[in-house]
Amino acid sequence: MHGSVSGYLLVNAEVDSMGGVIDSGGGIGVKTSPRRTAIEKAQAELRQEYDVREERRRELEFLEKGGNPLDFKFGIATSHSVQSTSLTDQQAEHFVNSEVKDSFALTASPHGDSVESSGRPGVPTISEPNTADNLLLFDSENKSVEGERNLRHPNRQNRTSESERSSKAHTNQNTKETEDSAIFRPYARRNRSKISRDPARSSSTDLVQNRGGLATSISIRRGSVEGKGCIPEAANQKDMHTTSVSCPVFANSNGNIVPKNRVSSNSLNTKVDGEPVVRESTAGSKTSLLKDEADISYSKSSAYLPVGESGLAGEKAQLVSTGGSPKAATIAGQKNSSTQLNGLRDSTVEEESLTNRGATGTNGLESESSHANNVEVNVDNERDLYKVDKLDSDEISMQKTLRVEGLLDQTVGEMTKTKIEDETGQSTTIISECIPECEMQMKSVKIENQSHRSTAEMQTKEKSSETEKRLQDGLVVLENDSKVGSILSENPSSTLCSGIPQASVDTSSCTVGNSLLSGTDIEALKHQPSSDAVMLDTVKEDAILEEARIIQAKKKRIAELSCGTAPVEVREKSQWDFVLEEMAWLANDFAQERLWKMTAAAQICHRVALTCQLRFEERNQHRKLKKIASVLSNAILQFWSSVEAEVPGELEETSLGIVKETCQESNCLNGRRCLAAGVKEYASRFLKYNNSSISYHSAAPSTPDNMCDPEILDISMVDQLTEASLFYSVPSGAMEVYLKSIESHLTRCEKSGSSMQEEVDTSAYDTAGDIGYNVTAFDEDEGETSTYYLPGAFESSRSFNISHKKRKNLMKSHSARSYDLGDDLPYVNNTGGSNSSSLMAKRPDSNINAGSVPTRRVRTASRQRVVSPFGCATTGNLPVPSKTDASSGDTSSFQDEYSSLHGGSAVQKGTEVESSVNFEKLLPYDMAETSGRPKKKKKTHQGSAYDQTWHLDPSVHVEQKDHWKKRPENNFDMNGLYGPHSAKKQKTTKQLVENNFDMAIPHTGSIPSPAASQMSNMSNPNKSIKFIGGRDRGRKIKGLKISPGQHGSGNPWSLFEDQALVVLVHDMGPNWELISDAMNSTLKIKCIYRNPTECKDRHKILMDKTAGDGADSAEDSGNSQSYPSTLPGIPKGSARQLFQRLQGPMEEDTLKSHFEKICLIGKKLHYRKTQSVIGVSVVSFVHGIQFSSCTGAGISQSLDIPGLHVSKYSCKSWLGFPENDGRDSKQIVPVHNSQVMALSQVFPNNLNGGVLTPLDVCDASTSGQDVFSLENPGLPMLNQGTPVLPTSGAHPSTPGSSGVVLSNNLPTTSGLQSASVRDGRFNVPRGSLPLDEQHRLQQFNQTLSGRNLQQPSLSTPAAVSGSDRGHRMVPGGNAMGVSGMNRNTPMSRPGFQGMASSAMPNTGSMLSSGMVEIPNTGNIHSGGGASQGNSMIRPREAVQHMMRMQAAQGNSPGIPAFSNLSSGFTNQTTPVQAYPGHLSQQHQMSPQSHVLGNSHHPHLQSPSQATGAQQEAFAIRQRQIHQRYLQQQQQQQQFPASGSMMPHVQQPQGSSVSSSPQNSPQTQPPVSPQPLSMPPVSPSPNINAMAQQKPQKSQLALHGLGRSPQSGTSGVNNQAGKQRQRQLQQSARQHPHQRQPTQGQQLNKQLKGMGRGNMIHQNITVDQSHLNGLTMPQGNQATEKGEIAVPVRPDQQSSVGTTTSTNLQSKPFVSPLSSNHSQQLPKSFPGALPPSPQQQMQLHSDNSIQGQSSPATPCNILSTSSPSIAPAVAPSNHQHLLIHQKQRNQVQSTAQRVVQHNHLGNSELSKKSQAERMPRVPQSVTNTTQTVSMGTTKGMPQASNDLKNIKAVGSTAVPALEPPSCVASVQITASKVVNSSNTDSAGNDPVSTPNQGLAQKHGIKGVTQRQQQSLPSEEKRPKLPEKPTVQNQKHLASEEQPHLEEAQELSSSKPPDTKVE
């Protein structure tokens, strides 16, 4: 837009739509000579009068035309009518017609509907009714414009007058009026709403629509865009038509138009009325009155539009005439001509035009707004405007136009003033708005905006003269530029750039001016192209004068036409006007509807006719085909008859000779003849062979036995075939024999019964096979393949029919299972008994084997022709139950399919019943009921229930019964429903028993879907229908009835259930499904599911007191009989009372007991790593709680906790095992060895494999608290669980996952944890439990236990972590255990180390505890969770602690947690999960414990369970252990470095090692492997971490860095420091206690003393301090780990290593490398960084030596990042290491500063600084990113999100992530502190302790946000890590110092900014 002419404001505005047209018209016409002003005033007056009269006239004309008086719109209505769609006659055609003359765009905007179709392609520019509407929106302007147009365009006088009138009348209501215009009237309301709603839009849109046209587009863009801003006003003020400087825009395009438009607004209308409008009016008038009005409005708009367009399209004259009334056109022409000509022709002119435009812009914009529509209207006609002749003819000559324009310019000036004044608010606004759009033109426009009225008017006037001059100058150009104008109009862009292509743009501008001038103007322009600007002025003036004359004439005419129209014109719309409009709209709608209906009817009729025609054609086609077929058949018959006639008489040789001769002759004569001869010869030979074969076999038919004998058949056939191998004919005798045999068999079967039938069928098949019809196509039920294999096609058809018949019989008799085996197996395998045999007891064996030929497609799901894949068991065994097959098939097609699938009908009853049961399980249906009532519509006997079959073969039936009885054990009574599903036969039963599971799935190899398979396999649909129907019936039938309650349900019916059942039946009657639902909903808590059949059977049993014999009568017996056990005093309908009475207390007690037991279980199951048991899972709290205990391989056992029944369902489904609907406990009876093993491990007390109750589990795992003993990663959670148990109560709820509930105890979170574990494995962070569930968990936790002490805090975490389980973890630092457990357990595969992994999903919550997901399990408890509420951490401390831990722990463990989440959540938190918050021990163990879960958990346990003293003692012990571990881990880490995968576990230990400086060297070796083994890290690292962490923990503990030992620990240390500051007790913090004031120093000392172990702790601490420092004042972390903070700085590399270690535990095993390792890790992660890590390791060593905190910091960083991005972590760690090194060098002071800042309480600042550093320090950022982003960098934001609740953690994690960058500052400070052993850390630590809590929270947020922000930079920078050189680190350090400072500043100044990322 702006590209147009810089001079033309409008150009820019309008550039969009039309290109330069609008632009060219922009400035011209701005200047209005006094004369023009006077003229404009006169014109305005004239216009008003004219409008009134025109309105009257228009009304009269409208009525004369037969218009609906309601549709007619007065004044405003007229304008509206312009828009009004009601005036369909105003349609584009009308506009086009009337304005086409004028080359109006009106065509485009003819339809009221088109109001919205501004961009209509039809319109050259998009000029449309919308344009008109927009113009009308600026009705007052439009009125003026229309008046002008009418004046200009006498042709349009009608329209013009109408529109002008309407415009005038609706000056205030123009917007609505416009909508109400004839065209738009129907949609007036809609349009109004749109326009009113979006006046700017409509104006702009409309303008844009207009702009769609040449000038119009531009005007619209500019006016439109401007109009958008302005148009709203304009739209609001329909008067604003004038305001819309649409025309002026065009004037800008066409110079004059703008003034004209302005004038249009007021004077312009007058002028329009005077002269210019006439033309428009003429064009408009051509349209119907309303159309005319609309057109007039359009015309005005058009006129203006056309003016612009004309310039653009060279249709300016036309545009002027049509769109820019002569006046508008003239003025526009003059102004635009001058401006445009100058502007378009000359950039100067354009500039002036812009100025003019500025002046005009104001008015012009107003005008434009109003005229944008006009322009639009004229857009289409614009191109027509190209036809100057048309314009000339239509409009006044150019000269007139020019003169008019001259007048207009003046008038426009006045008009502009008036209009601007009138519409200044709107118009001016519009202008201003428009102007902004054309900022190039904005100067003038803005000026106009500023002085919309006065300035715009003045400018308009002034610029009018200038424009006129320019137009005069450019008028010449106009004509010359007419083409250019056209081009511009065609190419709005060029016009848009009218300023750009000066010459062409100017030309178009001039052209636009001419167009604006109107036809007359255009002529004048044409004539004037050679003339000078003076001529232009003269022409303008003349045109204006002419326009005035025209206006006067119009006035007279109007006066004649209508008197007293003025009042109408002036009057504002009343409600009746709106009513009329609405009526018109409705009428239009009705008309439209009628049209639509008519159209629809026509279409329907057409379709009907077409359909009939098609049918007729089809019939003809069929007839033709029939004819052809008959001809062909006749020909074939004739051929064969002729051949037969010839053959007998001729010898083969003779015929051959003849044929040969014939062939030769024919070859000579005709190739065809030869061919025919050859064919004939072949046919004769074939017949001969056939005859001979028949003769040969003549004996065969006499000996059916022989025929049946496959050998004989084969031999005979072979003999025959060998003679003539070419022919494979079926011996006729054979077929006959076969047919007879089949028929006899069928007859026999019918007589004897289904079994016989089966035999017969089988024998028939066998016979077929014997006969040598190996194919035995008939075997295919479908018959589709019946002829497939038949030797002779002819006979084949017969055999096919036979087979079909037989099949039908078989199907009837066998219910499509006659060949059940065959359904998968081919029925008629050549083998003989192939399929039906199986059904028939006769050939079960062969059925098993015979599967080669798919004989019958029983409705097996796969429809496979498997050769009895299950054949032996199913086929051979199943054959007997043909009936069953039939019955089952009938009963349930699915079962039938299944039966056939499994073995065919043999299994039918038993199998089918089984199938139904198994169908769900993919076992054959064991439809006891189905078998009981085989409704297969098999043959009569089989068709009858299979019982008939049984009658036939009672022994089999009995056997089946026995089998069914036995089967329940074997099968999980699929439905529990089927008593002994009487196995069809023993074989079937055996198969069922043997294949209960196998049959269902393996038999067919495909599991059929009952419906699909049946249908697919069904021989015929009828059968399938029968099957289905039968199935339903069969279901009702119970085969052998076994009390479903006994064997049918996995769980025996309890008394409560019996009572409930009886009561429900009593109340509800035998509505078994309803009762089942009620029972299930009531018994949800027990996880017991009773299906309707079960309920029915049980009720029968209860009522009948029989084993289930009365099952059939269950329905009958259910209601009437009373149940003895029914609670007394419960009347009918009291079931609800009963349930309430029985259920309420039971549920409460059950839930309580369940929860307590779950907690106990959690303790017990301290997740022995060996637990093969999937674990006890709190499946969900359905009512209160549903527990699903999965023991062993997933066999479900009911946990008979008072109310607790673990449903096999859930277990099985959870395990993926087939489910019995939880009915059969017996089915579970045999416990697999693996299950026993698992159970023995998990439930040592329950080795008998009996059903375990949660109590049993609890008893079994009482030792769970021995975290140390349970360190095994296998069940690390068990360890944690116990330690967490104290918090576990809370944890369960906190985690937000049910598993979380046991935060500590995995068992509680078993299900969740399992999921978590899975999630952890797959790095899938788990979503948090629903709030209500969390709430429930919280409540339960609180309610449930004393150990739920943490529950409140946990619940808070749960609430906090509500969004994410991790978050849940967050709230409960202790909850960490829960969340951690919950999440962590799942998080890491290694048992509850998995918890650490779990922490990963819990990461959020774990993060809350500080990235120490698992550590959070413990750590959060200690301090990890804000709501640690753990005994470990006081609730308040928990929060700060959590913050701290999150910050501190968050740094290393927190990040790992995130990392873990992001990463495989293997490392997730293991390294970081150091339970920094938990205890320093936990922290120490955290990385490893996290990794190991158990070791951590032990730490966690003790901290969790133990408060200060216990924890301290425990921490001390753990520290010792930790030290041992650290030593071990150092060793392990060294080799783990080599073995990354498992070393990860060790490396997590290395993490601990990194926590302890000792391990840092060890860690180093693992670094390279660890990075490589990062993915495995999570599982192994957890294990190793546990193992190592324990030593580390002990070491760290010994070091006195409760949190230092591990990055997690360090994180904990931060929290612990805070906590210690609060609680100095925490075991890990005992040293911290000592160090509380001097913690940092002590930590530094310890770290130094510990070497890397301390460094690691320090790193952790530093990480925490970073996190805390970043999130919390590092000082705080420094406080708690002032030394850590200090060491971190010096040891940033070490810290990186440590972090890495910590994180490595979770992710890379950088943690083992500790600081060095982390450095290596980052490098190794980035790529071949191991050497770099080695260097870094050296650096770390140096760092460790320097302060050991440096290694710690890198460790923390790594820890932070590693979980998030093992690879990313490595780079970031590397970077961090480098940075740390630099920092150590440069940043020691900086670090000190940072630490000091942290201490200053600027934890946020430090966080921010760190965050800033993060971005600046790619390495550190990488760490942050890695840490935060569980996945790579992205994890960070996630971490932040996850850490939202764990703000501390999040920030901790973020700071941990930041540490690299933050470490730049924080770590730098730390490293400096550490290196310099500055007590600053320590000293600052205490100082920042309070800040830490706040800062951590604050800073964490900031840090997290910051980190998120810096993540990108981190991501970018991670590449740096690849540069492991110390130089890089130094550079980073050097860079970081400023960054630290900046970051500090940022953190202090804009903590919230961190959210940016």
Curated annotation (Swiss-Prot):
SMART domains, A to Z: HSA, SANT
Subcellular location: Nucleus
PANTHER family for the chain: CHROMATIN MODIFICATION-RELATED PROTEIN EAF1 A-RELATED
The protein's role, per its UniProt record: Component of the NuA4 histone acetyltransferase complex which is involved in transcriptional activation of selected genes principally by acetylation of nucleosomal histone H4 and H2A.
Entry-linked Pfam families: HSA, Myb_DNA-bind_6
Compositionally biased tracts (Pro residues): 1563-1579
Domain HSA, chain residue ranges per copy: 563-641
GO molecular function term, any single one: DNA binding
Biological process, per Gene Ontology: chromatin organization; regulation of flower development; regulation of timing of transition from vegetative to reproductive phase
Compositionally skewed regions (Basic and acidic residues) per UniProt: 140-151, 1805-1815, 1913-1922, 1932-1942
Chief subcellular location: nucleus
Residues covered by region (Disordered): 108-208, 261-287, 323-373, 449-469, 833-909, 928-950, 1107-1131, 1282-1314, 1344-1367, 1449-1644, 1687-1768, 1804-1840, 1876-1957
Organism (species): Arabidopsis thaliana
Tissue specificity note: Expressed in leaves.
PROSITE patterns: HSA, MYB_LIKE
Oligomeric form and interacting partners: Component of the NuA4 histone acetyltransferase complex. Interacts with ARP4 and SWC4, and (via HSA domain) with TAF14 and TAF14B.
Keywords (A to Z) from UniProt: Chromatin regulator, DNA-binding, Nucleus
Protein name as annotated: Chromatin modification-related protein EAF1 A
Extra facts: Decreased expression of EAF1A leads to decreased levels of H4K5 acetylation in the promoter region of major flowering regulator genes, decreased FLC expression and early flowering.
Domain named SANT: residues: 1049-1105
InterPro entries recorded: EAF1A/B, Homeodomain-like_sf, HSA_dom, SANT/Myb
Comp. bias intervals (Low complexity): 1523-1534, 1545-1562, 1759-1768
Gene name, Swiss-Prot/TrEMBL: EAF1A
Chain intervals with Polar residues compositional bias: 261-270, 333-342, 355-372, 884-898, 1116-1125, 1290-1314, 1344-1358, 1459-1472, 1479-1492, 1501-1510, 1582-1595, 1604-1618, 1635-1644, 1691-1722, 1734-1758, 1819-1832, 1876-1894
Similarity remark: Belongs to the EAF1 family.
GO cellular component, one term: NuA4 histone acetyltransferase complex
